[in-house]
């Protein structure tokens, strides 16, 4: 991946992006966050990694999220009941996968994931959050811990007090706790295997499945994810090129 700086992002931010220590782990094929993505996007990102260009401005919110994660993780230091940020690994159908969880309460058997996100995200359906946390719970089970509750702790970066004062259906605080449905063991197992298998098919040269309307963030006639290149691979995507041709 190549970075550009078309908007004169300050050097401190550039260095922070460049010094990101993130890794999905040695020998890991895909992480949980990749597994819940559309296989078309992941396969194209892998194939065209050297050709993908991202501007530093588009990484700023990721830095904000990492900062929030660090502060909240530090708040739990010294609490022996809390397992802090931890990367877990498992093998399934020949692939090594991993997932990095934020906190797990041993006493409550509660798995919490931190999100620094928008008001819109917490007021609309986010099935990918449910999938992500249940895959994390599956990983913990593989390591001998049963999870009984799942929770998102969301920090709303665009929250406005004036909106909260006017609207009853607007989040009343910039911190929102969301309970996530916990699936049964069989459903978790089947889902993880299904996600691994469809990504294996895509990676092994099989026909790439089309992204669904939901995965393209379709709103009316707009395909927001594709049009804004939020997937980073729209110019390499035959599905998106076909959609554009039909519109023209």
Q: What kind of feature is each model-predicted range?
A:
Residues 98, 128-135, 187, 226:
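Short, well-structured alpha-helical interface segments that form or flank functional binding sites
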Residues 1-8, 93, 138-248:
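Metal-dependent nuclease catalytic regions and adjoining charged, substrate-binding loops involved
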Residues 1-111, 118-131, 141, 163-169:
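Metal-dependent nuclease catalytic cores that hydrolyze phosphodiester bonds in DNA/RNA
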Residues 57-58, 133-135, 201-202:
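Short, surface-exposed linear patches
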Residues 69-73, 133-137, 193, 197:
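Generic solvent-exposed, charged/amphipathic alpha-helical segments
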Residues 114-117, 155:
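Generic beta-structure capping elements
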């Amino acid at each position: 991946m190549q970075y550009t700086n078309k908007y004169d992002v300050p050097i401190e931010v550039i260095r922070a992006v460049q010094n990101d220590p993130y890794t999905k782990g040695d020998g890991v094929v895909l992480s949980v966050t990749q597994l819940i993505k559309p296989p078309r996007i992941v396969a194209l990102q892998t194939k065209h990694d050297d050709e993908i260009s991202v501007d530093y401005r588009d990484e700023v919110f990721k830095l904000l999220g990492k900062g929030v994660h660090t502060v909240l993780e530090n708040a739990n230091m010294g609490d022996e009941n809390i397992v802090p940020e931890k990367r877990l690994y498992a093998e399934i159908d020949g692939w090594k996968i991993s997932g990095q969880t934020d906190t797990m309460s041993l006493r409550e058997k509660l798995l919490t994931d931190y999100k620094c996100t928008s008001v819109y995200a917490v007021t609309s359906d986010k099935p990918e959050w449910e999938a992500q946390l249940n895959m994390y719970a599956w990983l913990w089970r593989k390591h001998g811990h049963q999870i009984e509750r799942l929770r998102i702790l969301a920090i709303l970066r665009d929250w406005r007090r004036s909106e909260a004062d006017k609207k009853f259906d607007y989040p009343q605080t910039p911190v929102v706790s969301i309970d996530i449905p916990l699936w049964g063991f069989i459903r978790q197992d089947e889902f993880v295997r299904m996600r691994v298998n469809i990504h294996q098919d895509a990676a092994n040269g099989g026909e790439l499945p089309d992204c669904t309307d939901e995965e393209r963030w379709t709103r009316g006639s707009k395909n927001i994810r594709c049009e804004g290149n939020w997937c980073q691979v729209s110019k390499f995507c035959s599905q998106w090129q076909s959609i554009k041709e039909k519109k023209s």
